[in-house]
């Protein structure tokens, strides 16, 4: 009798546990639908949604339902064991997990509303201190956001408590179990297929944000097992993994090759006897979407547009990353990315050569001007390893300079805006010697939260710009959702105009070459295509120019240093290493559209999923045809997809080998050896 009684008690408790587990999951589903409704109305007020956004949200609800039934199967056993141990503990822990998931979903919806992006493994590419700075600069959680979270948590707790009175029948329980196990056959559909969507925002809107973050986190810490050695053996062919063929030196140094970069710049310049000063202005978030002729959001950089007409102008330039962390290694060293970005390797960065170190050996003095903390993204570590002479950052600015305003009183600010950065640089350069210079500027204002000096003035300038473009009221409403973004662009444009007005007063102006480019596009307004985030301009301006030109050929940040070195070597009698590890082939001076390169991208730290190969782009397993103005159209061609994926995998293998084994350059090319 005792045995029968215990078995019956166990059976009854198990049935009770199953029903309680199902009840909480059904309430979880109700909350997910509630959050989807909130998401639609919140994002509709915050950003410009796709025309079919309601349909996308309904598709998202379908994916949420499938996700929930999948999770219900995987969590069932541990939850039932916990229920049998302690009903109270089960309610507490599983209730907490539901609250955590919903809280994460709300927070990530707000992140999407601010950035138009999903948060994934790029989170793990930043230190805790850097994450705090990013969140603080964006204003953190506002009171309204905090109140919303409190209301949701209170609602969830109330529902969980009241749910104890809900008794579900056997039919509901059986149906839930059958549907849950059936859902496992469709597990791969819990995340949408990116290839089915016309825009990245449409995909992001449909995706469950919390599930994306948690599943990405799991894959980050438990990646699919792949032997680096076997990959290398399989893909290594001795051919270039990055476009036009290089003459490689040795498989021990995967990227080392003879430098045959042609000088495409020299013919446009009046060459004097003095070595020119080189000034690089790297503009935070300067995308082609809102700068230059043909900008699809209309141009908000009138002065820069006028400068393009007096310059060598490349309209189809690709950055190598969707954030700032890779811009210095790419522009000044044409370097690979390692696992999470070249500079992210910190003290373990492989030995390399760069424009900074090469010019230092040839008599140049280098300076880096930045209005923030150069420790961010390991910029200072990278620049010091490249033997930069002087680094001027935010802490070096005096009391006469004023930081950009924080989003809320007493909050964090990234540092000083462009006007102050340029002003500080003239103060520093007033004491510069007669040696030729390499001056590097990295700006800050066009960065979330886009709080700038004279905000009201530039907000009015945006309104004037909207009227000048003859936008109707409906268009103006959409543009006003990103009013601070556009205001920050106009602020930069004015700062650049003042910079050149002041520079013209300097004696060395006539012997200076200016390079202006963006590090990537803003994430808001929403990115139109998969390649849009990387699309930036390049303007090379100088009083030394004897002719101007506009080029439509596709080039990248990786091409800058090879071309500058070829220019200096060919026109100023300077000798440089005959072998180099650069990924870029140099700038292409074709005036019509073409792409002769293969370019890998590191979208965010920990995300190397984009690769362009001549007229084709792959993003994960999607294949796109690339055409004029960097338009992309998704196509199906399994043979071509496989061919390009092999090239991409070879690059990724070479990339890890060179970076993890310090085999980018031999000892003979290292800075201390050559001195």
Task: Cite the ranges covered by each PLM segment.
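Generic low-complexity, intrinsically disordered sequence content enriched
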Residues: 122, 164-166, 235, 243, ...
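Solvent-exposed soluble domains appended to multi-pass membrane proteins
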Residues: 252-675
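Alpha-helix capping and helix-coil boundary motifs
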Residues: 5, 9, 46-53, 61, ...
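Transmembrane and membrane-interface helices of multi-pass
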Residues: 2-231, 673-675
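Intrinsic-disorder-associated interaction segments
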Residues: 3, 7, 11, 15, ...
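Extracytoplasmic/periplasmic/luminal assembly and interaction segments
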Residues: 227-255
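Generic detector of well-ordered alpha-helical segments enriched in charged/polar residues
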Residues: 15, 19, 55, 129-132, ...
């Amino acid at each position: 009798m005792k045995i029968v009684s215990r078995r019956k008690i166990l059976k009854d408790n198990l049935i009770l546990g199953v029903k309680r587990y199902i009840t909480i999951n059904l309430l979880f589903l109700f909350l997910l639908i509630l959050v989807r409704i909130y998401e639609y109305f919140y994002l509709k007020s915050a950003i410009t949604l796709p025309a079919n956004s309601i349909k996308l949200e309904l598709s998202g609800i379908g994916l949420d339902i499938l996700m929930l039934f999948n999770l219900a199967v995987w969590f069932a056993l541990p939850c039932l064991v916990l229920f049998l141990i302690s009903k109270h503990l089960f309610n507490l822990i599983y209730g907490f997990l539901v609250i955590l998931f919903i809280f994460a979903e709300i927070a990530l919806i707000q992140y999407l509303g601010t950035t138009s992006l999903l948060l994934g493994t790029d989170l793990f590419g930043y230190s805790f201190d850097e994450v705090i700075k990013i969140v603080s600069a964006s204003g953190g959680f506002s009171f309204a956001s905090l109140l919303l979270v409190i209301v949701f948590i209170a609602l969830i707790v109330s529902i969980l408590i009241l749910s104890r009175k809900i008794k579900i029948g056997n039919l509901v329980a059986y149906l839930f179990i059958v549907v849950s196990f059936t859902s496992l056959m469709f597990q791969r559909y819990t995340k949408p297929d990116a290839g089915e969507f016309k825009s990245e925002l449409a995909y992001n809107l449909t995706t469950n944000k919390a599930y994306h973050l948690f599943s990405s986190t799991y894959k980050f810490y438990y990646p699919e097992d792949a032997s680096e050695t076997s990959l290398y053996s399989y893909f290594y062919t001795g051919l270039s993994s990055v476009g036009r063929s290089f003459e490689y030196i040795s498989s021990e140094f995967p990227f080392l090759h003879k430098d045959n970069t042609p000088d495409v710049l020299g013919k446009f310049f009046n060459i004097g006897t003095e070595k020119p000063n080189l000034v690089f202005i790297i503009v935070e978030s300067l995308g082609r979407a809102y700068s230059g002729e043909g900008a699809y959001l209309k141009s908000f950089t009138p002065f820069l547009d006028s400068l393009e007409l007096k310059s060598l102008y490349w309209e189809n330039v690709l950055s190598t990353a969707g954030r700032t962390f890779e811009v210095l290694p790419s522009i000044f060293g044409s370097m690979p990315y390692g696992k999470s970005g070249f500079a992210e390797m910190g003290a373990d960065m492989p030995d390399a050569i760069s424009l900074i170190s090469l010019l230092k050996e040839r008599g140049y003095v280098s300076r880096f001007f930045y209005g923030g903390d150069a420790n961010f993204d390991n910029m200072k570590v990278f620049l010091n390893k490249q033997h930069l002479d002087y680094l001027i950052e935010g802490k070096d600015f005096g009391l006469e300079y004023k930081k950009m305003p924080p989003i809320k009183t007493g909050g964090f600010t990234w540092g000083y805006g462009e006007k102050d950065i340029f002003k500080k640089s003239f103060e520093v350069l007033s004491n510069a010697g007669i040696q030729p210079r390499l001056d590097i500027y990295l700006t800050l204002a066009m960065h979330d939260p886009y709080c700038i000096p004279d905000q009201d003035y530039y907000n009015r300038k945006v309104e004037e710009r909207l009227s000048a473009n003859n936008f109707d009221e409906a268009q103006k409403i959409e543009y006003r959702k990103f009013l601070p973004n556009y205001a920050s662009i106009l602020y930069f444009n004015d700062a650049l105009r003042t910079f050149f007005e002041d520079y013209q007063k300097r004696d060395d102006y006539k012997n200076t070459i200016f390079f202006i480019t963006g590090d990537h596009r803003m994430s808001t307004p929403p990115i139109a295509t998969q390649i849009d985030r990387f699309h930036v301009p390049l303007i090379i301006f100088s009083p030394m120019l004897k002719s101007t030109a506009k080029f439509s050929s596709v080039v990248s940040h990786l091409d800058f240093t090879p071309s500058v070195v070829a220019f200096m070597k060919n026109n100023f009698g300077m000798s440089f290493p005959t072998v180099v590890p650069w990924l870029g082939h140099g700038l292409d001076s074709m005036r019509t559209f073409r792409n002769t390169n293969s370019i890998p991208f590191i979208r965010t730290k920990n995300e190397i999923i984009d690769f362009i190969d001549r007229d084709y782009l792959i993003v994960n397993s999607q294949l796109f045809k690339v055409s004029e103005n960097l338009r992309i159209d998704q196509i199906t061609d399994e043979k071509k997809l496989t061919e390009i994926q092999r090239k991409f995998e070879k690059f990724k293998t070479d990339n890890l080998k060179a970076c993890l084994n310090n085999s980018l350059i031999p000892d003979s090319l290292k800075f201390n050896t050559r001195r």
